[in-house]
Amino acid sequence: MEILTLGSRGPAVKLIQSLLIRIGYNPGPVDGIFGQVTREAVREFQLDNGLEPDGVVGPATWSRFERFLIGYDTYTIRQGDTLYNISRKYYTSLNAVMTANPGIDPGNLRVGQVITVPYGIDVVFTDIDYTYEIMDRDIRGLKARYPFIQVGIAGRSVLGKNLYYIKLGNGPSEVFYNGAHHALEWITAPLLMKFIENYARGYARNSSIQGYNIRDLWNRGSIYIMPMVNPDGVDLVLEGLKRDNPYYNRLIAWNDTGLPFSQVWNANIRGVDLNRNYPASWMEAKAQEPSLGVDGPGPTRYGGQSPLSEPETQTVANFTRKHNF
C-alpha cells in the first residue's frame, strides 16, 4: 500500500478513515482527504499500538492496520486459556471464534494450538471506494471468519486480476449474481460483498434475513456470486490512470471526452463495454455504434471486435455454461 501522509488523497485514505472510526478513533469524515484530524487519529492509534507516533501511515502502521482490515488475528493457546476469555480479550463473540475454527473442542484446548480470532467489527466496509485490492482482502477475511463459504477463481482480467466467485449454500437450485460489469457501477461490488457477509453470518448464527431462515435457504439452493467482473476498469475509475499501466497511452487516446476517467469510464481496460460484448444481440448492438458516435475502443458502448473478445466476458460465459442458472 502507498505511504499516506498529510495531504494524501484517495481510496486508501478513505479506507483507513473508515477503519479508525470502527475501532474507536476520530479521523473526521470519511472523505479521502488526509488532514490534520486524520493525522491526529493515526498518531493516537500508533501510540496505543507501540508504533512511532509520526502520524504517517508507513509500512509498520499499515501492517498493524492490516490485521483489523482483514478482520481477524491468530492466537496461540496458552496454559489456562478458554475460548470465552479469548473472545472477551478481542471484543468478539464466542460464536464467532467457534465458527472460524470448525472442529475445535472448547474443553480440550492444547497449549501451542493456533486459532483464528475474528475481531468484533465487520469485514466489508460500505462507505469507501471499493477497489480490487480491498475486495481481494475482504474475500480472504470472510473466508477466515466463515470457512464454510467456498471461494474460487473463475478467470482473470486483461491485467491479470482474479475474477473471484463465492459460493453460498449446498442446495440443488443454482442462482448467479455478478457485479461491476461497468466500471462506474463499482458500487455493486461492495453491495454483493456485504450480502455475502450478512448471509454467511446468518448461517453461522442460524438466524433469518427478512423472515427467511438462512440455513433453510442454504440447504435448498446454491448462490454463486462474482462481485467484480471488471476489476481493471474499476481501479481505473477509483485510482486514476497510473504511468505503469500497459495501456497508458492508448487509454489517454481512447478517452476523448475531455472528462476524467472517474466520470465517464464504463469499459474494461481495453475500451470494450463488457455488457455489449456477449453473443446475445451483439450484431444489433454493433449496428447501433455509428449512431452513438462510437467507432472503436472508448469509455462506453463499444462492443469489441467480436462477441466474447474479452477475457472477462469469456469467464462469465464459461462460468454460466458450467452451471444450471
What positions do the PLM features span?
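Short glycine- and acidic-rich boundary segments immediately preceding or forming the N-terminal edge
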Residues: 3, 96, 118-159
